[in-house]
């Protein structure tokens, strides 16, 4: 009992996040990773709740250092050479085995009756397995990638959903907001390290060079997305926690700023819009209207003064983003190509790894090249079957958020909305690590809904 309490505590979560940040900055991820895997494995064997796993799940990928990245611009073989691949496989296998033990010991016995959203989630999972099947030039890597999607959208979702059964849902939401602050600490810390140490990331005229915004695990778009999607959770924290409300409001501001500094236009639009929406409606709705009004007034005046005084520096710093304007950056040609592939293979698509001759090229080295739009990816890679299954699944996920509606669940849904809207021009729905937070939010919200039904 004492051990489980320790693993589920805020100090433990903070220690995990701090180790991830230190491991990334010092390029000692292969020292930190085994430590975290061993701790998580011990927790899986000794804890009844999966709460302990959330900080590791939501920060683990951020260990990857740009210098050692298997993706652009270094194409390093650091992780796959010598003894390092053995260390990675050994400790990830330990983590995987302990997770399977936990599912068998704690999750499966808790399944009573039909799990929520089972049929839609199962249909989506089957469509993942069938991606590209029967298509000429089918690549078996597509099957493996489909299985990885199932691991996130089916296995991980139900493991977290049942693993959190019995937890106080109010406490879970507060803990999730706290975890968001730790994720922000890691991401912003890594960005500060990048902006202050990468040679050439600031050009001679003071602009951030967009092509240099790389953290090993992602380039500007995934980085901006990973920071921006935290904004709804900080809006929730500002509404829910009057004592720490000002802290969470400031975190909303900081995350918006750093999301924009990634030079990602997607992040500029989504994070900027999210902040404005939450800051505005918080003035009229919820439990902390006075704080929203005061901070909004101060921020508005400060922003106007700041732009007037530092206009030249701001325009220089953001010139890479400004100069891009409203060009499609190749998206339209990708979407036309996706539709052509859909015409060639309309039932099951061409598969995830058949979209491009360079389909193994990507920032993480093992992700396929995709069409940068959820619908286009579904049509080209998974066909009509995949698109229909995803539509059924997506509709089914609305129920726990909007039935027995509350402001808290609306703000949790804002995380899902951010996830979906950002993916209109990117691949975040199918970069499985960018779906981890979404999966956690969905599992917690389903538990909240279950508790509401029981109370009735």
Question: Where in the sequence are the language-model features?
Answer:
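N-terminal signal-anchor transmembrane segment
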Residues: 2-101, 130, 419
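Transmembrane alpha-helices of multi-pass inner-membrane enzymes
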Residues: 14-21, 42-43, 232-234, 409-422, ...
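Aromatic-anchored transmembrane helix interface
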Residues: 82-94, 114-128, 137-162, 180
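Hydrophobic alpha-helical membrane-interfacial segments at the cytosolic entry of transmembrane helices
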Residues: 116-123, 174-186, 251-254, 288-311
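Alpha-helical transmembrane segments of multi-pass inner-membrane proteins
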Residues: 122-126, 152-155, 171-201, 216-282, ...
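A membrane-periplasm/extracellular boundary helix in multi-pass inner-membrane enzymes
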Residues: 189-195, 279-322, 339-343
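Long extracytoplasmic/lumenal interhelical loops at the membrane interface
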Residues: 319-382
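Hydrophobic transmembrane alpha-helices and their immediate junctions
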Residues: 382-420
């Amino acid at each position: 009992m004492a051990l489980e309490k320790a693993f589920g505590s805020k100090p433990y979560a903070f220690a995990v996040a701090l180790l991830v940040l230190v491991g990334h900055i010092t390029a000692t991820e292969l020292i930190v990773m085994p430590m975290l895997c061993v701790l998580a494995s011990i927790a899986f064997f000794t804890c009844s709740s999966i709460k302990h796993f959330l900080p590791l799940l939501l920060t683990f990928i951020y260990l990857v250092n740009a210098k050692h990245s298997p993706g652009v611009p270094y194409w390093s073989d650091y992780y796959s050479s010598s003894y390092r691949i053995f260390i990675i496989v050994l400790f990830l296998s330990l983590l995987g085995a302990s997770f399977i033990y936990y599912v068998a010991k704690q999750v499966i016995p808790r399944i009573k009756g039909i799990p929520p959203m089972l049929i839609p989630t199962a249909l989506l999972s089957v469509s993942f397995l069938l991606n590209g099947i029967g298509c000429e030039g089918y690549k078996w890597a597509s099957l493996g990638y489909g299985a990885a999607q199932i691991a996130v959208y089916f296995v991980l979702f139900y493991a977290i959903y049942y693993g959190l059964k019995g937890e106080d849902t109010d406490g879970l939401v507060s803990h999730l907001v706290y975890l968001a602050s730790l994720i922000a600490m890691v991401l912003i810390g890594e960005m500060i390290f990048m902006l202050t140490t990468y040679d050439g990331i600031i050009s001679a005229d003071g602009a951030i060079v967009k092509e240099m915004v790389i953290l090993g695990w992602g380039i500007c778009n995934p980085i901006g997305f990973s920071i921006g999607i935290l904004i709804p959770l900080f809006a929730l924290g500002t509404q829910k926690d009057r004592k720490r409300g000002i802290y969470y409001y400031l975190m909303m501001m900081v995350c918006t700023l750093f999301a924009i500094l990634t030079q990602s236009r997607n992040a500029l639009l989504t994070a900027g819009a999210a902040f404005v929406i939450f800051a505005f409606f918080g003035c009229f709705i919820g439990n902390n209207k006075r704080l929203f009004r005061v901070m909004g007034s101060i921020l508005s005046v400060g922003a106007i003064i700041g732009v007037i005084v530092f206009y030249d520096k701001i325009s220089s710093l953001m010139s890479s983003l400004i100069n891009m304007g409203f060009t499609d950056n190749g998206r339209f040609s990708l979407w036309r190509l996706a539709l052509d592939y859909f015409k060639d293979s309309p039932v099951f698509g061409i598969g995830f790894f058949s979209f491009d001759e360079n389909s193994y090229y990507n920032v993480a080295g093992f992700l396929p090249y995709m069409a940068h739009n959820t619908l286009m990816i579904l049509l080209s890679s998974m066909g009509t079957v995949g698109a229909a299954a995803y539509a059924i699944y997506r509709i089914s996920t609305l129920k726990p958020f909007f039935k027995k509606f509350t402001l808290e669940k609306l703000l949790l849904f804002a995380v899902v909305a951010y996830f979906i809207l950002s993916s209109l021009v990117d691949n975040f729905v199918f970069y499985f690590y960018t779906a981890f937070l979404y999966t956690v939010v969905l599992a917690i919200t389903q538990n909240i809904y279950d508790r509401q039904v029981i109370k009735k």
